Amino acid sequence: MQDFVNRLWYPKADDCIGYRGIKWLLTPLSLLFWCVSSLRRLLFKLGIKAAVSLPVPVIVVGNITVGGSGKTPTVIYLIELLRAQGLNPGVVSRGYGVKIDGVKIVEPHLGADSVGDEPAMIVARTQVPMVIGSDRVSAAKCLIERFDVDIIISDDGLQHYKMARDVELLILDGERRFGNELLLPAGPLRELTGRQKTVDFTIVNGEAKEGEFQMILEPTRFIPVSPRSELVFEPVEHVVAIAGIGNPERFFTTLAQSGVEVIKTKAFEDHQKFSLTQITQVTGNSPVLMTEKDAVKCRDFAKENWWYLAVDAKLAENFDQRLMDKVRQVIAVKQGNRDVV
């Protein structure tokens, strides 16, 4: 199914005419999606539906396409950057695939099955205060009250207009970009490509164009998936790689570029919930390599010879200064408003 969707949304020159036919059959549904989503955004823009402003700056990290683009590494990068500048950031997120009544604090010991894979990964890596819930405003208020954060990052929050934002970061896959440039379901877009012109920063995971900031995901080391394992990874000839992320081919390419010889790859659905049986049916007893996001879902049952590849985001040199200039402006305005009150 995932391969079919990818070929529909990200067509190649040699794709058969059948894919083009399906695309046009889905276009009326895309038009309906555009009407509903555009009306919703317009209501917030006109003030008919009120967006809630918070007393601290809000940085939104998101995209206008479905699937992986590098949002989670970007969030981790921002956490470390803001901390280095003396700020106390917190993160809010939906918690994909998790049913929550109200809001939930993401504790380091909680697994991906109870908080979602991205929140589990972010907190495991950074120990940042993080709250998840469908109502991001309530989640943000919880962060401020419980953890005294002075700046909030909204993970995958570009389309959540109920919470007012001060800085918008659009994350874009440099290889896929906007695909066939059609809205869901005929294409991968959540919003039209013109939305890019309204954000403060566009960060491209890969080759950037003029006015965009390039991000490189730099592999750092292979880490055992199991917290009980101390086995060091050594490249061997029978490694199997698996990935349950939005763009698994990017991960497999990264492994190849790192000099790892992989005899077999298996792409699962994004946000795949794994089991030991499911993975070993693919890998047998072979050494396994996976992404960090997948690893947080496999820790409880991982074998000793399973590792994940940790990556760090590296952004264009001028990005940090440009972002912090914007953040300081927002802080000054919000502090001024509090002084007036």
Swiss-Prot record:
SUPFAM superfamilies: P-loop containing nucleoside triphosphate hydrolases (SSF52540). ATP binds at T65, V66, G67, G68, S69, G70, K71, T72. InterPro entries: LpxK (IPR003758), P-loop_NTPase (IPR027417). GO terms for molecular function: ATP binding; tetraacyldisaccharide 4'-kinase activity. GO terms for cellular component: plasma membrane. GO terms for biological process: lipid A biosynthetic process; lipopolysaccharide core region biosynthetic process. Pathway: Glycolipid biosynthesis; lipid IV(A) biosynthesis; lipid IV(A) from (3R)-3-hydroxytetradecanoyl-[acyl-carrier-protein] and UDP-N-acetyl-alpha-D-glucosamine: step 6/6. Keywords: ATP-binding, Kinase, Lipid A biosynthesis, Lipid biosynthesis, Lipid metabolism, Nucleotide-binding, Transferase. Transfers the gamma-phosphate of ATP to the 4'-position of a tetraacyldisaccharide 1-phosphate intermediate (termed DS-1-P) to form tetraacyldisaccharide 1,4'-bis-phosphate (lipid IVA). This is Tetraacyldisaccharide 4'-kinase.
